[in-house]
Amino acid sequence: QIHSGLGNQMFQYAFYVALKHNQSNTKIDASIYRHRPSHNGYELERIFAVEPVHATIDERNRMADVGKDWFSVFRHTIGWKRKTHGQLVIEPNPSHGWCPDLLHCDNCYLQGYWQTEKYFAKVANQVRMDFTFRQPLNAIDMALANKLTKEKSVSVHIRRGDYIKERRRADYEVCTVEYYRRAVEYIQAHVDSPVFYVFSDDPTWGQEQNIFPKGTIFVSGHEGVDAYIDMQLMSLCCHHVIANSSFSWWGAWLGQRENTITLAPSTWFRYRERPDIIPDNWIKIDAE
């Protein structure tokens, strides 16, 4: 199942590619967006050069109808069990680590986020190829892209928006001023003459915190259906400072530069563990 915003859709698609490598008849189901629009809706095929195989209406209905009677939901840490007729598999608790056996799940309907590179490490090259941005940049963004590739550019992602709303704030508001200050200091200590490019849904907040050095550029102008352009531009930077956000996770992961430094918060959520979400070659910075 494909659901939620762009970054999460990308994790789910990457999981699909890994599954399809083992089970050639794997299909996606993005029908949830017809009934429950989220963020900018289903975006994968609009933004990237991907052509996943979609489950048909009959296939989806058959799964849903049968599910009322015999689907078993497995939330256990150890993973899942096989049934002769099939099964609904809900992602095991990510706080206990990833579940490699799921890559060989047969006759299953899988729901989850699958937020770790470990699920698709063996098909990483294919995932990178698939996540080629379809649309050319406009003249203004192309000029910025050229700068990013020529300078020792550092993308910094600050996500506030939905993260500071009362119902999510306690768990999601992880990337503090101190996190960004430590990240900037780390980059300055390890990179000669870095240029920081800040991508944020609240640039005013970033400017008011006195975190960033003189010459920092705050990138703006990409909202709504064009928000993905921020990810595209982030991926062109030399180095990355990400938020606890799947959006900036992919902005960093898609980068192709050599000797890249990627800094990530040591805590993804305040009250939930995510031990596998940060790749081994990224550097964790204390977020408290």
Q: Model-derived features: where do they sit?
A:
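Short amphipathic alpha-helix
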Residues: 12-19
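A structural signal for isolated positions on well-ordered beta-strands in alpha/beta enzyme cores
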Residues: 27, 155, 195-197
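Short, aromatic/basic amphipathic alpha-helical patches
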Residues: 37-49, 206-214, 274-279
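Secretory-pathway luminal glycosyltransferase catalytic domains
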Residues: 38-191
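Leloir-type glycosyltransferase catalytic cores
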Residues: 270-288
